[in-house]
Structure formats: C-alpha cells, structure tokens
C-alpha cells in the first residue's frame, strides 16, 4: 500500500513499490494569490496529461527530468530527486513583478529571456534570491547554478516553440530542479510539473490569458482554458 509522503497545494507524493521511485498525484485544488483554495473539477487530470506530454518531449531533446511514466488519469511515476529550495522563473515578456516593481508596460518583449531565482516559501512570499546568496547558503554549487541556468533557457526555448505551434504564447514559466546521486557524482534534473499551473500562457492573437492567470480572474472559465491547451497539445 502506498504511503502519503507530502501533500502540496495541487499535488500529493506517495511512496511506490520500487526504491527511489515515487507516485505523484494531481488534484483539482488551486491556491489563489489571496490564499483562498478552490477546486476546479478536472484540472488535475488535464495537468497530468499536459505535464506527461511535455516531460516526454523534453526527454527526447536530452533534458533529464524525473518523469518515468503516466500511471492513470491523475497519477504518474517519478524518480526521487533531492529538491533545490528554489523556483527558477524564466520570463520573456514583462508581466507580474516587472510591471509592479519596475513600472514596465505589460506585454513588453525582452531582448532575451530573464531568469529569476525565488525561494520556495509561501510563508515568505517567494522572495527573489541572487546567485551569491544561493552559493553562500550552500544550496547549490557554482556548477549546479550554471547548469540550471543553461537548462532553464533551453527548456524555455523549446516550450516557446511548442506553444507557438498551437497558437499560444509562452510569457513566463516556473521551473524546479534538484539533484540525483549516481555513485559519487550528482546530476541536475528537472522536477515538478510543466502545465498551465506553472506557465503564464496568452493566446497568440488576442493576448487573452489562459490557464492559471484566467483561473485567478474567472474560475468558472478555467477548466475550458486548461482543456483547450491539452486538446491542442494532443494534436501535436
């Protein structure tokens, strides 16, 4: 019988019958910016489908990630990874904090994608942390930081092309990484999920917000937005 190991805002981790493998289950829950938790019926199924599809595609281009296989509608088998305590946010368009903190016009396109490191802490509102702090806190080595940045940009470039191909613009994505030990060596690996919960996605023609951004503004329309993305990816 699988044992619950961790329950987050939208996913739960369970043990599996195999050592170093876990079961990740997607729920319909969503935590809004104001802390309110709501249910969007069917969201977990769609996110499982989308993330499984994307992780498979990334594996095909040489991006190591924790995804092994989709088990059922809501669950997937993943490799155990020692998680870095960071979110790696890649942005190519001014939105969110760039508008609030720098007064930029929303929608302004950067010459190159910008990488932000954020501490994974809802309690402290995910503060920005720089590379010197990450090194001094002992969270990552210099080589690991460089690998994470290189992989994050490569992932973002691939995802941008993937979404453009289905009429959707990737504005920002939130990635997570960790390390896997192979003997005395360690490998940096992509973890968590890639879905409308972790990406800011706009309709390429109208700039209509999709996925989680739409969920924040109009929860009643959220499911159809997630389904639109899943259906278009299915056709790829």
UniProtKB/Swiss-Prot annotation:
GO BP of this protein: 'de novo' IMP biosynthetic process; cobalamin biosynthetic process
Reaction catalyzed: 5-amino-1-(5-phospho-D-ribosyl)imidazole-4-carboxylate + L-aspartate + ATP = (2S)-2-[5-amino-1-(5-phospho-beta-D-ribosyl)imidazole-4-carboxamido]succinate + ADP + phosphate + 2 H(+)
Alphabetized UniProt keyword annotations: ATP-binding, Ligase, Nucleotide-binding, Purine biosynthesis
Database matches in Pfam families: SAICAR_synt
Top-level taxon: Bacteria
Cited CDD domains: SAICAR_synt_PurC (cd01415)
EC number: 6.3.2.6
Molecular-function annotations in GO: ATP binding; phosphoribosylaminoimidazolesuccinocarboxamide synthase activity
Gene3D superfamilies found in the cross-reference section: ATP-grasp fold, B domain (3.30.470.20), Phosphorylase Kinase, domain 1 (3.30.200.20)
Cellular component aspect of the GO annotation: cytosol
Similarity field: Belongs to the SAICAR synthetase family.
Pathway linked to the protein: Purine metabolism; IMP biosynthesis via de novo pathway; 5-amino-1-(5-phospho-D-ribosyl)imidazole-4-carboxamide from 5-amino-1-(5-phospho-D-ribosyl)imidazole-4-carboxylate: step 1/2
InterPro entries assigned to the protein according to its UniProt record, in alphabetical order: SAICAR_synt/ADE2_N, SAICAR_synt_PurC, SAICAR_synthetase
Descriptive protein name: Phosphoribosylaminoimidazole-succinocarboxamide synthase
């Amino acid at each position: 019988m699988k044992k619950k190991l961790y329950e987050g805002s939208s996913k739960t981790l369970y043990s599996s019958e195999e050592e170093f493998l876990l079961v990740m289950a997607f729920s319909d829950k969503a935590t809004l910016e104001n802390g309110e938790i709501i249910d969007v019926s069917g969201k977990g199924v769609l996110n499982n489908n989308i993330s499984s599809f994307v992780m498979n595609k990334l594996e095909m281009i040489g991006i190591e990630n924790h995804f092994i296989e989709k088990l059922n509608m809501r669950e997937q088998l993943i490799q155990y990874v020692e998680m870095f305590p960071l979110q790696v946010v890649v942005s190519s368009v001014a939105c969110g904090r760039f508008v609030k903190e720098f007064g930029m016009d929303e929608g302004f396109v950067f010459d190159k994608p910008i990488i932000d490191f954020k501490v994974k802490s809802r309690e402290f509102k995910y503060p920005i942390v720089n590379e010197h702090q990450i090194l001094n806190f002992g969270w990552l080595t210099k080589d690991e930081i460089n690998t994470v940045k290189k992989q994050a940009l490569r992932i973002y470039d691939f995802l941008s092309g993937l979404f453009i191909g289905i009429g959707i613009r990737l504005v920002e994505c939130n990635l997570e990484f960790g390390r896997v030990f192979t003997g005395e060596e360690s490998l940096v690996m992509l973890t968590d999920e890639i879905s409308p919960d972790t990406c800011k996605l706009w309709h390429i023609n109208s700039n209509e917000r999709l996925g989680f951004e739409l969920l924040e503004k109009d929860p009643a329309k959220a499911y159809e937005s997630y389904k639109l993305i899943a259906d278009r990816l299915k056709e790829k």
